């Protein structure tokens, strides 16, 4: 089992409903450590760059609008197999299909407002972390 880092965003629906502490409790209960965390207002440029992989998808504009509609909490999580573990803890993108006990089953309102983002690979985690954090921001 490898100790690794992953990237997380608590999305505007989570900050708007003031549930970031409850989401963090689920993350920590799963054995992941929050080693970097900042509450920010994502700019349009940041959102477009971050979700560039979805640029040609029909939901891209709506996604950018949503991610810039309010504050988000960007995080670096650390633990054994952090990428896979966090994806399991997040649950399916569609909260109706998410397993009981997952973040999205407990807190997400819809597919579009699904509370959290998590990196899908260790390589993407490194890239995503670097967009929002430098080494001095991470206290392992």
From Swiss-Prot:
Subunit architecture: Homotetramer.
Domain of life: Bacteria
Binding-site residues, ATP: 11, 59, 87, 93, 104, 114
EC number: 2.7.4.6
Keyword DNA-binding applies: no
The keyword Lyase is annotated on this UniProt entry: no
UniProt-recorded name of the protein: Nucleoside diphosphate kinase
GO biological processes: CTP biosynthetic process; GTP biosynthetic process; UTP biosynthetic process
Subcellular location, record wording: Cytoplasm
PANTHER family (UniProt xref): NUCLEOSIDE DIPHOSPHATE KINASE (PTHR46161), NUCLEOSIDE DIPHOSPHATE KINASE DDB_G0292928-RELATED (PTHR46161:SF3)
Any Pfam family: NDK
InterPro entries for this protein: NDK-like_dom (IPR034907), NDK-like_dom_sf (IPR036850), Nucleoside_diP_kinase (IPR001564)
Gene Ontology molecular function terms on file: ATP binding; metal ion binding; nucleoside diphosphate kinase activity
Catalysis performed (reactions): a 2'-deoxyribonucleoside 5'-diphosphate + ATP = a 2'-deoxyribonucleoside 5'-triphosphate + ADP; a ribonucleoside 5'-diphosphate + ATP = a ribonucleoside 5'-triphosphate + ADP
Keywords: ATP-binding, Cytoplasm, Kinase, Magnesium, Metal-binding, Nucleotide metabolism, Nucleotide-binding, Phosphoprotein, Transferase
Signal peptide: none
Cofactor(s) listed: Mg(2+)
Location of the active site: 117
Function: Major role in the synthesis of nucleoside triphosphates other than ATP. The ATP gamma phosphate is transferred to the NDP beta phosphate via a ping-pong mechanism, using a phosphorylated active-site intermediate.
Family: Belongs to the NDK family.
One GO CC term on file: cytoplasm
């Amino acid at each position: 089992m490898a100790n690794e880092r992953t990237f997380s965003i608590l999305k505007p629906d989570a900050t708007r409903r003031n549930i970031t502490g409850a989401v963090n409790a689920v993350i920590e209960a799963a054995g992941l450590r929050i080693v970097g965390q900042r509450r920010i207002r994502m700019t349009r440029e940041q959102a477009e760059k971050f979700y560039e992989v979805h640029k040609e998808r029909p939901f891209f504009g709506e996604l950018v609008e949503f991610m810039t509609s309010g504050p988000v909490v960007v995080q670096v999580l650390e633990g054994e197999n952090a990428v896979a573990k966090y994806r399991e803890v997040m649950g399916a993108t569609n909260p109706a299909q998410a397993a009981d006990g997952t973040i999205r089953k407990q807190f997400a309102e819809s597919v579009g407002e699904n509370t959290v983002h998590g990196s899908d690979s260790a390589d993407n985690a490194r890239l995503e972390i670097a967009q929002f954090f430098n080494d001095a921001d991470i206290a392992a």
